[in-house]
């Protein structure tokens, strides 16, 4: 007899694999061999990114062998009732994360249009989907019932929508399931359109399988057979030779064993009959989980021989009895039943099966039942009030400050044997992204006020102003012994709406309503603080530089520019304390659609804004209000001379625990590098820079810091550089390198003067060539001699590796670099150092002397303005984040197909379901060209809701294709983020549904959670731990 707790069980739901999932970006093969001139930094650190591999792919598929004529005739009729269900759970809810998937169902009422499938297909939360019949007719489906416990649900479709085939329904005959019966499982196995798998029923009295932390069925027996079904077969009918459905495919083993688990159809048949009659499907509970235990185990628990004899005489074929497994605290049976009680009678009726117990409880909601159990050989009779199972199953949720919340469900309570009470975080995002876990938190209090249920939580959140920092107390459902306490930053500006969603079983949708407008932020108050003092540090300069460091935390409400994270924390260097200017790595502040918090002296937290983003050299300049900081912040003194190889220096950095470390060391090398491009999704990277490495192991452990001299002058910044994502493990590489401060000074001086630097750059990426290579490529001996004299420490020139795709409006007739050009001079200045390329910043055109194909030539090379390189607009449509191709895209592509670039997409959205993947360009909507976001917005606004439309797209590798997408304005309304300096956050959010959102503010839906988005075609969302 199997007990509950089958670790190898897996539900048969397939991840979506539509034909629209085309190759979007070819990964380069990983190799340790460097390309010519490659100077990739060698000290990259790899960070784990979750790899969600579908274990169901490991299952063998067991197709049916040649069938008899009777079986063939049966199957021909059955397949006309089987449908392929393609669906999304549009946001995380209860045990399920937002996702897109496909499964199977079958028609059980052709006249009224009812389809039976699994509960984990119908989804506990918002569902959106359609079904495809055997003749490939498509029809929308909506949920009309999902059972609170058992793994079945009922969908409804419009029978009139099926015009080209006669609808057939399968008769449910649960009593036909017998041990030894030959069966067929007819469904979409492994995502295929139709698979027919054969098997033989081996057991009828198996306990329901446990699927782990997610949804699991209980309080029912399951049927076991060997059919080797795989992902996508969830909801398949299990039919006998008479063509009757005798069970419902639900799950199986994921360890390679050809074992499948079927749900008996007794309770689905009752629910269907209630729905047909227009009656509610009543479900009763005493909040107790029962399991089947064989008689030998029951005897050990205290079943007396007399009662065993009575049971065996009354039910000669039975070999097991029901035993209490879990009694929930504060439930009707709490303090009355105990674990291990053997159930004998309910209301005076002897029973040994779940079906009869369910029948009694479902017909006794609100009434009292009498239970007779044996406990240690003693008869114990108790009375329990039967509760309503639907009342403890969440049918509403609230989204606020980026997170999604509902009352704790009976499913979760049963799994962890806790009371069905509390506020459950089903989408831990935005302000409520706690300890880097996406869901599973129970919020005990917010702002020192208890939140025992969702209503109390809403009342507390109504009173908290925007940008407030409040204390929350919480526990994770998997570790209720440990209570966590955190300070969270309440975001009601990126997420202004507090919205209530309520399930509507009449429409199959969840109805949204606004609960409260945000309270404006309180004016900031100046604070006092002192910096720590380093004990035992022999270098006075290191002790002094502490006053120039601040901690920078950047939170992004939306994934843009291919950046993989929603939050990043590190340290910045104060370069002007009077003006509040801080230099920080661009791997921490990648773009300005963000919230930046600066922590001074580990005590004062102030907001900051982006002042400048360098397009090439991996630093950002941010600014906080210094009047709010009453602390002895010190402006760092920056060196004006470049640090040299072999020079002694003091390394001051911050380790992974954000603790300061100091080491006296020396510069080992200064190498011209470009951070490797990310193949799966272009994102910002530093190019054409001199990277400094030092002789200390601390350098690899610290992502931020400085190199300083004995006089306390900062010789270099120590920055983290976001690198590529490895194709095998889907892990991001981060490099830690030094950046000489003299390269920072020209830009910084302009910012200090209140002038916004308007840099111009050369539209290319270069790498170093040595003189041996240069000679072979046609550089004359005269020039080689000049190089050796101009740069005695490094005899090198620069070769053009890649010419960026020019921005719109660029003069295509102008001279440009070509790949392979060797640059000798720019405006007459010999170029042998990266810093000498800075001449490009101020000039519209440069006269370049180059060697091309072995010949020297002069060309007039135009520079490119950087004002348009940063993203200033994003359109969110059907769950896809669309933007103008950012700089990293232009660096890696040779031709821009349009200015509508897919930057990211949300799980559970139409873009995810239909395969509109990141790194694609959209060139037309319904045949109308859409060269830019304005034209795109204009065309898609004409499309009615719930209607298919065609998108012509081009992959990053120039492969054109067409994808059809169905619009969904209810769950994924179109909205925009537009840069607007008049707004406090620098951006404003606009809704395109003016009738529905008259205030123009886009709805704050859980599907805009950046942690639920993927920015690369590999589909991996970043969940790297970011300790606070």
Swiss-Prot record:
Catalytic EC class: hydrolase
Bridged cysteine pairs (disulfide): none
Biological-process GO terms, alphabetical: apoptotic process; proteolysis
Ranges annotated as biased composition (Basic and acidic residues): 990-1001
GO cellular component, one term: nucleus
Region (Disordered): 1-49, 983-1028
Enzyme Commission code(s) on record: 3.4.21.-
A GO MF term: serine-type endopeptidase activity
Location of the active site: 120, 151, 233
Compositionally biased intervals (Acidic residues): 1012-1028
Location within or outside the cell: Nucleus
Domain PDZ: 289-374, 876-957
Family named by the database record: Belongs to the peptidase S1C family.
PANTHER family (UniProt xref): PRO-APOPTOTIC SERINE PROTEASE NMA111
Known role: Nuclear serine protease which mediates apoptosis.
Protein name stated in the entry: Pro-apoptotic serine protease nma111
Gene: nma111
